[in-house]
């Protein structure tokens, strides 16, 4: 089962050729996903190198957040959020980022970037999550507009009203706008389960039964994720 989930996730998120980075919709931050995995024996070195790269990015002007984690198969996925494409380009040209990126790429057996558009980025101002929870959802194109309304309502309500829900972040693939990548940050497992059992998710889940045609849940290892404190909207 684990192998099947890994293959599905890799096929959907990594199996794409590197896509050109395009600007997100107007008034939305610029986002992209970066994915890394190491050859056997290089795992710890790559973890350290990716951490250094993400720190360099977060210290760059115009970078709002870099959130992510490592799954049970050693694949690291990070959502990079910038104020706009200009900030993205400036960060990539930074000497600190270029040096850190070169080291990470040297150690990575696989490195992919996925062009994405920010759909909805809901976040509290402060907090630390136990890990990043991720999901990939494929939506029936004929029901895409209806799905977006249901998802946006659930995200906004949960982050505003549920104490342990720190951030719910949704992006869509630029090349396939009916494919959603979700990154969710909860204070702990109790907060996550309270959200799943709560009214907002239950209403959402009931409404989308015929809208979601495929779903992959990505299980990440425990890894503290601290909110950047920056406005993501």
Where on the chain are the PLM-derived regions?
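Acidic/polar helix N-cap motif
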Residues: 42, 84, 140-143, 176, ...
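Surface-exposed interaction/gating patches
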Residues: 127-168
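Positively charged n-region of N-terminal signal peptides that target proteins for export
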Residues: 1-4
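Glycine-rich beta-strand-turn "strand-cap" elements at beta-sheet edges
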Residues: 23-31, 64-76, 99-136, 166-178, ...
């Amino acid at each position: 089962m684990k192998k099947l989930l890994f293959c599905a996730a890799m096929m959907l998120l990594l199996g794409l050729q590197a896509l050109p980075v395009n600007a997100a919709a107007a008034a939305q931050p610029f986002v992209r996903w970066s994915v890394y995995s190491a050859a056997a024996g290089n795992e710890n070195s790559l973890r350290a190198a990716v951490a250094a790269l993400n720190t360099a990015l977060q210290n760059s002007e115009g970078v709002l957040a870099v959130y992510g984690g490592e799954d049970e198969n050693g694949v690291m996925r990070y959502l990079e959020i910038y104020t706009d494409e200009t900030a993205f380009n400036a960060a990539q040209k930074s000497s600190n980022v270029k040096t850190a990126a070169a080291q990470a790429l040297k150690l990575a057996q696989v490195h992919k970037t996925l062009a994405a558009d920010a759909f909805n980025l809901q976040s509290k101002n402060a907090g630390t999550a136990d890990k990043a929870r991720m999901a990939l959802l494929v939506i029936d194109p004929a029901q895409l507009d209806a799905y977006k309304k249901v998802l946006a309502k659930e995200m906004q309500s949960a982050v505003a009203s549920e104490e342990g829900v720190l951030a719910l972040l949704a992006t869509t693939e630029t090349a396939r706008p009916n494919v959603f990548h979700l990154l969710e940050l909860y204070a702990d497992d109790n907060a996550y389960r309270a959200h799943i059992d709560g009214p907002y998710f239950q209403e959402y889940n009931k409404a989308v039964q015929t809208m979601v045609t495929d779903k992959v849940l990505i299980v990440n290892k425990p890894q503290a994720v601290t909110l950047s404190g920056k406005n993501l909207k």
